[in-house]
Structure formats: structure tokens, C-alpha cells
Amino acid sequence: MSAQQAQDQVDAPTSSLPAITQSLPDRTMDPAAGGEGPPAGEMSKNAAKKAAKKEKQAAEKAEKSANKGIGKAESKSKPSQKAHKKKTDGPALIGIDVSKEQDFSGWYQQVLLKGQMLDYYDVSGCFILKPHSYFIWETIQEWFNNKIKKMGVKNCSFPLFVSEDVLKKEKDHIEGFAAEVAWVTHAGNSALERKIAIRPTSETVMYPYYAKWIRSHRDLPLRLNQWNSVVRWEFKNPQPFLRTREFLWQEGHTAHLTEAGAREEVLQILEHYAHVYEDLLAIPVIRGQKTDKEKFAGGLYTTTVEGYIPATGRGIQGGTSHCLGQNFSKMFGITVEDPSAKPEEKKPALHVWQNSWGLSTRTIGIMVMVHGDDRGLVIPPRVADIQTVIVPVGTGARTTEAEKTALMAEIDALAAVLQAVGVRVEVDKRDYTPGWKFNDWELHGVPLRLEFGPGESAGHYVTASRRDILGKDGKSTIPITELGVQVPALLETIQADLYKRADATYKAHVKHITNWDDFTPALNEKNLCMIPHCLTEQCEDEIKDMSARKVEEETGEAQDARAPSMGAKSLCIPFEQPEGIEKGVTKCTNPNCELFAEKWCLFGRSY
């Protein structure tokens, strides 16, 4: 199923499948819990030893990386707490051996490594994206490219190097990135006369050329986008996909004649970002505007989509669309003549209005954190590189080669039916037991597993197991004659159900708070807080300090300034405002603030 097919299905209704009355085979999903072991001749002792050694090395590598501070964004546990961290039930050889609820940081590392999403690199804070995760990014690219090209946006590529003079040209802008800029100072053994920066973002790279290319109002709007990587170096707690020193993203940069044209595009792009999360990744987001304190440095205003990580109770910024106003066009001299001036009048120069907007591979990390469980990844069907896997079952030492060959021929035919209707399907022909394969595919988050053996062949059906619902509740049977219809429908049902569950969880953890005494307790219960707020920077700072200080007093834990915030910060001013604020009457929720509330503002601990 391509990204275009996925988009075609976004608004398609999902319906429950017709009831199937055939009884389901009783096959264990856990070989370590008394299930099927390796049949004779299927898996040698040497193969088992190699598999165990490989998993041990991966675990040691993850532990070594963790000791260096990688992925340690969660607050440190007390020694007494560490002893109570829960191990998950089930086989540890190929599966996750820590609980997502009890040890989220350890779980996140394991699920990414064992789920084949990435590997660690020898430069701290940099990671290798493996095909399993990169496919998700490719799907997002294809979907988003299709949307922005319809808007008239064209893709391009600018150099990754920035001269120091250009980078410093816009002081307010670069102050937001100054500590994170990586510099090239040498070429071989020779020191450069002028050091060169590696782009943290591309405003200062691109805008000198916008001034060169835009000569008339007829050249507007100019809409360019880059798919590239950027480097932001200075931080102590890198987390895969969330905070990395190099990351992949797209950055759009556009120029417009009027503020109205720029504003329309800002909201249009933000809506596309929201749909990436909601329609592709099955993740709910809240649309809103950043406060002046949290907006993009040098911009006029910033709009955002904000997600929520239930396991930690933290908010997370999903993507931002900025109106830069005329700040950069004045700095870089990007002007056109006023087309509304009368012919006999001298046409004054107008500074163009500009936008920038970006979405990164952080999307993948958010997806993993929201949907994954103690068995491993849970990948929404629309972005899964393998949507359905077919596992041969029911064969053993007594099964003849002819019977096995005939069964595999039937399975290949089933796969061909699914491929013909656009399902990304794989047949697992590896020399492992079915129980081992079940665990492995669950670990990798494949949305749907189909089992097919002699019993299914005789009954003309397949046994289907959903990844998002484990056990008998997630099992059903599908007649072979209905395979090409019911499997795509079931995949869409899985997609819809993932979103519904995540959306219900998000909504349940946004608390409307008007009494300050309820604020920190709500945060401690893993909630985000919607409060009446005055929207001043000083008040935001005070709320963060007060909520952080209260946590430190209660736990005795000092706050790491670069770790996910203990204190609550403003996430956004939601576009959808609840009722209840009366202008000039409703006070700001901060008890030390004497100002009236302007808007409901979403606060929370965040990444």
C-alpha cells in the first residue's frame, strides 16, 4: 500500500468484519511459556547459541550507550526504586525484558534496538536509521510532498555550510541556536581563515538568495522546500529521534506579498502536519499557537501541533509552522515594488512577508512512544513497511516434503492475492518455530499476522492475529475467498482503533485547572494542564520554577536543566478555546500574578 493509497483511505469508513464461526487454533505466542520448541532438524544448537550471543551483544551495547548518557532523559531513580523495576513476562532472548510503565527509558532503548529501528553510532548523539524506520520517513515524505506540491511548493537543495558572517547577520535569530552550532575550523591540518558553521536551520543560508531572485511582485509567492539533515550540537541528553545532534527533516521557506497570504499558508501547512500525525501515524495532536516566550527566535508568531506521551505524562512538540513577518526580509533586503501604487507615483519598496515550517524524524519517536507496548513496536498499517506477515504453521517431523511444498505454494498464492490489492505482505520462510516467529513479528510491530497450516488449508480460511490487540481478543478467521477484501479492511480498522485509543487517552489527561493548588498534583498524575493565563513571559517563567521547585521538595531530586522539564512550560495556546474566561474578570491561575487571564493555555512537562 503506497502513501497515495494510504491517503485515499484516510477518510474511508471502517467497519467491523463479519463474524466467523470457525474455532481458532490454540497456538501459543510464547515459546518460553510452554509453547512449541524447535522441532527436530529445524534449528540447530549452534544457531540457537548464535542468536543468544547476538541478543547479548545488543543488550550490552544498549547498556554501554545508556551509561554514556544516551537516552537518559528521564529523571534518575533512587537506588531503592531501581530494585522495584518490573521485568516483563515472556522470553528475553528476542523480546523486551523491561516494562514500559516501570522503566520507560530502558524500554525505549530496547524497543528501538531490538525492533530494528536504529543502531547507535560512534559519535554521541548520532544514530543510524535502519530500513524499518526509514520506510516510515519515506512514507511521510511521499505524502507531504504530494500535499505541498499542490500548493505550488518546489523542492530544492542548499549547501549545509554557512559562513560566520552570514550566520551572525541576524542576531536575534541566531541567539536561539548559538550554543548548538557546530563549526568547521580546519581543512586537513590547516586552520581555516574563517570558520564555517554547519547549518542548524537554513534561514540564513537561503535568504541572501531570495533577495537576489525576488525582483518583482510577479516573482511572488516564492515557495521552496528542502529535505535535508541539520546539526544542533550542544546538549547532554540525546534521545533517539527526539533529541539528536543530527536529524532529518523538511524545512519550507516561502515569501509572500501580503501578511494575509503568509497567514493562510501557515495554517494550511500546520493542518498538513496534524494530518501526518492523525492520519498516517494514528496520533492525536492539539493545534495551537506558541506563546511569545516559546515562539521561533526572530519570528512573528509560531503555530504548533502538540502531542502527548502517556507513559511519562509529558507533552511533545510535533511540528511547527512559523510566520516570520518581515523580520528577515528587512535584514536581508528582500523587497519588491508596491504593485498598488499609481503609475505616476514613485513605487515604494515593500518588504516581503515570510514563513518557515519544519517537520522532522521526531515523528517516528513519538509514534513508537505512543503505540509501543511491552511486546515491542506497534506500527500503524499506513506507515508499516510490512503490513501483513504470513507464517506457515502446523508442520512437523511427520510432515512430508511434498506436503510442505504444497502448503508453501498455497501460501505464496495467498501473498499474491494480497499484493494485488496493494497490501505490503511478507511470507516468513525462515527456519524457526512458529512461536519464535510470532514473538519476532510482534517485536517488529507488524500490524497483522496471518497463520496458515494444514488445518486452515482444509477449512479454506486463514487465522488472523492483530498486533494491537494481543491474545484471543485479537484473533479471527478470514475465508480465503474474502482475503483480498477483508485484510485491507482489517488493516484500516487497526489504524482507526489505534487512533481512537490514543485520542481517548490524550483527552483523559488534559485537565482544566483554575485553582493553583491542583496544578502540580495534576502534573504528578501524568496530566497536561489547561489553565487561564495572562500570556506574559515573566509569569510563564514563574510557573515553571514554582512547579519544578515543588517537585524537588517532594522528591529530593535536583532538576537537570537539559533533561525533559520537571517544571511545567507552556506548550501552546490551543486554537479551540474552552469557555469560562471572562475578559477583565478571570484572573491568571498563577497565585503570584495580579494580571487577568487572556486565554486558556496548555501547560505541561515536556520533551
Question: What is the predicted role of each segment?
Answer:
Residues 2-607:
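NTP/phosphate- and nucleic-acid-binding module
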